[in-house]
Amino acid sequence: MFIIKYYYWEGNKIFSPLVHFRKRNINFLNNQNIKLAKFAGFCYGVKRAVETAKKLKQENPNKNIYILGELIHNTDVINELESLGIKTIYEVPEHGEGICIVRSHGEAPEVFEKIRNAGFELVDLTCPDVKKVQQKAIELAKNDYFVVIVGKSNHPEVMAIKANADLYSDKVAVATTIEELEPFAERIKAHKKVGVVVQTTQMVSSLNLVVNYLNTIAKEVLIHNTICQSTAMRQKEAKELAQESELMVVVDSKKSANTTHLAEILKNCTKTIHIENDSELDENILKNITNIGITAGASTPQVIIDKVINKIKGGI
């Protein structure tokens, strides 16, 4: 007999992670109806990170401010931060001075230590929701669960979650497909219990796929659905908007996990394009289209969304 336990996220109220709340804007121009998703743009974790980085520079104009890795996956925002004197670095130097920011995706514990040892003042802007996933993974590892992280192994958030769990267990796997789990199958079968956490920006379909497979090989499966509410609500609402749209425009970086997943979901619903900003809009794809839906990933600032809308309204 399989024992399956589901524990769903019990954090803030369901709408609180979302920064932008708006009615769908319906514009009529050139016989086109444009509808903007309510849940489009910065989530609260991204908004917090960007605003804090800018505030740090304002309060410390003479200090060097560094971000380890891109603060968020949006080129326009990174360029803006660079223009303010906030530099992105990809490795921690042996020696440094000033402030070093840990981005919203989080980092491995040894990276925090390395930053401090280098002489930097450390500012941790790991998203609170990501912190919760790390803590759940640690809790499972400490309680002798075989930990399965549903996520992309090369994504910085997942790498940080795994690094935290690895401190307490050598039984940790990362997967979004059955093929990625199969090498661990015998170890999972031999173990009494399996615990699951999820990358905050993953698709529910990936979680279900992994869980269904685990149910066939594990004796007990404990599932923490740690997909953040902003991701879940963004995907749900965008699917509903797609049902009444001939074309969906998804705005945000191609490197953004939550946005690529969003575009992937919508492509199964209606014609969909994924653009980083208004410069990538092609007038040919908008020809003979009456109903256009627009959504945006968690790393998209409002100014970029507005530029996309205005360009479509202006007939490109």
Annotate each PLM feature.
Residues F21-I316:
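The feature marks the mature, well-folded catalytic cores of soluble enzymes
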Residues I4-Y6:
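N-terminal start and proteolytic maturation junction detector
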